Amino acid sequence: MRKKIVLTGGGTAGHVMVNVALIPKLKEQGWDIVYIGSHEGIEREIIGRIDGVPYYSVSTGKLRRYFDWKNFKDPFNVLKGVWQAYRLIQKEKPDIVFSKGGFVSVPVILGAWLNGVPSVIHESDLTPGLANKIAMPFATKICLTFPETKQHVNTDKAVYVGAVVREELKHGSAEQGRKLCQFDGQKPVLLAMGGSLGSKKINDALRASLPVLLSEFDIVHICGKGNVDTSLVGQKGYKQFEYVNEELPDLLALSDIVVSRAGANAIFELLALRKPMLLIPLSKAASRGDQILNARSFEKAGYAEVLMEEEVTNESLPAAIHRLYENKDRYKKNMEKSGSSDPLQTLLALIQNTAR
């Protein structure tokens, strides 16, 4: 009899990509897969491109750490989502639920617990996010990406697994990436990306620095939806994308160095690909500070250069990029020492062993 798994997670691409990595492997092992996400989150778009994975949506509320009148309404949306998730899980009868986190995951984990279905939570960041903190007491197992996270998760449910990286990222073609961007191959390539939602600060500083940077690099700029600067379309050596999906492996293969936010999934993918990186973590004013901890951990290990968001200027950004490129061989050498275990297989085995 075929086993069934419910996957959940959303809000940003980082809360979906581990699920995307799991789906082909789960299919190979004969699992039936169902996805529960939010009505309008980015997960709906990403999972909608994958054949054979039915998508259901539930109500949810954002878990804010600041005052907003929606804070009074959203708990009722979460309760509604718990009821919807409970009914969906009751109907689908999965053997296990796997959560990548994000606010949509809370009702789904609670719905699984109410149905007596085991669940596994995956925590990417060094310290747990608010949604995962709420869901952890109701989960069967908690998978960790950083070994240091055990200090912040006071439970024997926690298991260090490591970072799960999408297999297709390892098989990109630099030549295909070069054709896509129409670069001539005469300069090293800088890839800049500000996360699935984009980053105005990074976008603005990078564009202001183009006269300096284009003398040294060809630049691929993944700027976020609605953030393409039409005045720069056609600029030689500068290619903008709002968001990429199938093209990403080729663009990564093409790139010599990368400027990125410090979301855990993204930086571990860059580590697996041995890409020297300049990390610009989200500031504490705009987040809970998890990206700062992620970035500092990579800086300490010698994998990355770090530039704090409040330090980003039209002068500091190109200087940091130049410094990264000058030291790229040292960063690559440090990355080679990071090991080559297979967290994806470890996670698949844990899911198999935890399922009822």
From Swiss-Prot:
Gene3D superfamilies per record: Glycogen Phosphorylase B (3.40.50.2000)
CDD domains tied to this protein: GT28_MurG (cd03785)
EC number: 2.4.1.227
Main location group: membrane
Entry GO MF terms: UDP-N-acetyl-D-glucosamine:N-acetylmuramoyl-L-alanyl-D-glutamyl-meso-2,6-diaminopimelyl-D-alanyl-D-alanine-diphosphoundecaprenol 4-beta-N-acetylglucosaminlytransferase activity; undecaprenyldiphospho-muramoylpentapeptide beta-N-acetylglucosaminyltransferase activity
Annotated binding of UDP-N-acetyl-alpha-D-glucosamine, by residue: 12-14, 166, 196, 291
Any one GO cellular component localisation term in the record: plasma membrane
Presence of the UniProt keyword Transferase in the record: yes
Catalytic activity of the protein: di-trans,octa-cis-undecaprenyl diphospho-N-acetyl-alpha-D-muramoyl-L-alanyl-D-glutamyl-meso-2,6-diaminopimeloyl-D-alanyl-D-alanine + UDP-N-acetyl-alpha-D-glucosamine = di-trans,octa-cis-undecaprenyl diphospho-[N-acetyl-alpha-D-glucosaminyl-(1->4)]-N-acetyl-alpha-D-muramoyl-L-alanyl-D-glutamyl-meso-2,6-diaminopimeloyl-D-alanyl-D-alanine + UDP + H(+)
Main function: Cell wall formation. Catalyzes the transfer of a GlcNAc subunit on undecaprenyl-pyrophosphoryl-MurNAc-pentapeptide (lipid intermediate I) to form undecaprenyl-pyrophosphoryl-MurNAc-(pentapeptide)GlcNAc (lipid intermediate II).
Protein family per UniProt: Belongs to the glycosyltransferase 28 family. MurG subfamily.
The protein's name in its UniProt record: UDP-N-acetylglucosamine--N-acetylmuramyl-(pentapeptide) pyrophosphoryl-undecaprenol N-acetylglucosamine transferase
Species classification: Bacteria, Bacillati, Bacillota, Bacilli, Bacillales
Gene of this entry: murG
